[in-house]
Amino acid sequence: MPKMKTKSGATKRFKKTATGFKHKQSFTSHILTKKSPKRKRQLRGTKLIAKSDVASIKRMTAC
């Protein structure tokens, strides 16, 4: 049986680290005027994927 192909969109969005997978926070690209400074500040940076989603991310990225 051939190797499973990776989902190219998933490989662009998720990065494997020693502690799990990190990803960019959503809701930060546009329509930012109605969001409070506190909300925008908390959405900054990268977050780790929840443990319940790790198996599906591994399948999509073929890690």
Swiss-Prot record:
Keywords for this protein: Ribonucleoprotein, Ribosomal protein
SUPFAM superfamilies: L35p-like
Signal peptide start and end residues: none
Spans annotated as Disordered: 1-22
Domain of life assignment: Bacteria
GO annotation, cellular component aspect: cytosolic large ribosomal subunit
UniProt GO BP: translation
Alphabetized GO MF terms: structural constituent of ribosome
Family membership: Belongs to the bacterial ribosomal protein bL35 family.
PANTHER family in the record: 54S RIBOSOMAL PROTEIN BL35M, LARGE RIBOSOMAL SUBUNIT PROTEIN BL35M
Name used for this protein in its record: Large ribosomal subunit protein bL35
Phylogenetic classification of the source organism: Bacteria, Pseudomonadati, Pseudomonadota, Gammaproteobacteria, Pseudomonadales
